[in-house]
A protein has these predicted regions:
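Active-site-proximal substrate-binding core of FAD-dependent oxidoreductases
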Residues: 260, 297-333
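Beta1/beta-strand and adjacent pyrophosphate-binding region of the FAD-binding site
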Residues: 15-26
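Predominantly flavin-linked oxidoreductase catalytic cores and closely associated redox partners
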Residues: 119-245, 259, 275
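FAD/FMN-dependent oxidoreductases across multiple families
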Residues: 134, 152, 224-298, 304
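C-terminal auxiliary extensions adjacent to catalytic cores
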Residues: 321-353
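Glycine-rich FAD pyrophosphate-binding loop
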Residues: 37-56
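N-terminal Rossmann-fold NAD(P) dinucleotide-binding loop
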Residues: 29-30
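A conserved beta-strand/loop capping segment in the N-terminal third of enzymes
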Residues: 62-115
Length: 353
């Protein structure tokens, strides 16, 4: 059996050097990679999936999200369902219905993520199929990234954009960090309205119904530890009301909400890998896009991500205490009182998004 000597191993690694290695080809990683590639920075995205791939997500693009995406990628086109009607429910009863000034854009993540990736590839972006194993900081400051069943990669910056189950984050923290569980299913299209229901029975979460492209997505989530808990809650509140299809499968995903800075200038966590989902609404696409942009800025400027992403870290701290208040019994009481003013409900909803 032939073994490479040390010099050959070093040559192999150097042959696979990139200024930036991005783990994960979801929106956060692809936006970051697109901006780097567009500005002439050598980068590569690593992902284990074959695109297009399924993705569990409501798929809501808020005005902030699609506005920022338009600014960063003006040529990007994608299919979406426009929604302006918002129905707010409390304990199974409709308490307010409003028409939003700005549309919500509902996308199918399987298609949307693939279209984003194709946009990155169309400008010369590189994609490697493989699974992240671990990273090692080298004496010269570079980072050696091991890929399962693949050649190692050497880089100046490692960007962890590998989602809620991030292996990059897990290496840094030593454990998985899950806070909320969300489950959903596809049903036939109904009214073109966004339904949001709160209940004191729910664990810091809500029931939802989102119109999407060719179908609707319904489900619920919150601080639940297992699918069994959510299934029991849905059975009690919604299956009997014929909102969910009894024979359709429920798909689920955990979302980490503990925002994390890696503490290393050359290792950056973005999107769900960094715990950046909205702590109140649990929406993640805006924060995927904005943290992808902020990672690009940090790399281009040679500064810490904690600086370019300062405003987002500050927002996360604010969201934490607002969320605790909103989902408390006192918060639900305030919601009930405020429901008598549709203008107030509308303003609060648009403020969150």
């Amino acid at each position: 059996m032939y073994f490479c000597d040390r010099n050959e191993k070093e040559n192999l690694v150097m042959a696979n050097f990139h200024h930036v290695v991005i783990i994960g080809a979801g929106p956060a990683g692809t936006v970051c990679g697109y901006l780097l590639q567009k500005h002439g920075v050598d980068c590569v995205i690593v992902d284990h999936a074959t695109f297009p791939r399924e993705k569990i997500c409501g798929g809501g693009l808020t005005p902030k999200a699609y506005g920022l995406l338009q600014e960063l990628m003006p040529d990007f086109r994608y299919e979406y369902q426009s929604v302006r009607r918002f129905k707010f429910m409390l304990e199974g009863k409709t308490i307010s219905e409003v028409d939003l000034d700005n549309e919500l854009r509902m996308v199918v993540r399987k298609d949307f993520d693939n279209e984003l990736l194709q946009q990155y590839l169309s400008i010369g972006g590189k994609l490697v199929k493989g699974s992240f194993s671990r990273f090692e900081e080298q004496p010269d400051g570079k980072i050696l990234v091991s890929i399962k069943s693949g050649e190692p990669l050497l880089c100046d910056y490692l960007v962890g954009a590998d989602g809620a189950n991030s292996q990059v984050r897990r290496q840094i923290t030593g454990s998985r960090s899950y806070n909320t569980l969300w489950m959903e299913q596809y049903v036939e299209k109904g009214a073109n309205e966004f339904i949001f229901e709160l209940s004191k029975q729910y664990k810091k979460g809500y029931f939802f119904s989102f119109p999407s492209v060719g179908k609707d997505i319904v489900g619920m989530g919150g601080y639940y530890s297992s699918p069994k808990e959510i299934r029991a809650q849905l059975s009690k509140n919604h299956i009997r009301g014929n909102i969910l299809a009894v024979d359709a499968p429920l798909r689920g995903s955990y979302i980490p909400l503990e925002t994390l800075d890696s503490g290393k200038k050359q290792v950056i966590l973005i999107g769900d890998a960094g715990g950046f989902a909205n702590k109140l609404s649990y929406e993640g696409l805006y924060y995927a896009i904005v943290t992808g942009r902020n990672a690009w800025k940090a790399i281009m400027e040679g500064t810490d991500f904690s600086i370019t992403n300062r405003e987002i870290f500050r927002n996360k701290r604010k969201e934490a205490w607002v969320t605790d208040l909103f989902y408390s019994r006192f918060g639900l009481w305030l919601v009930r009182i405020g429901a008598h003013s549709p203008k107030l409900i509308k303003k609060a909803f648009e403020k969150c998004y």
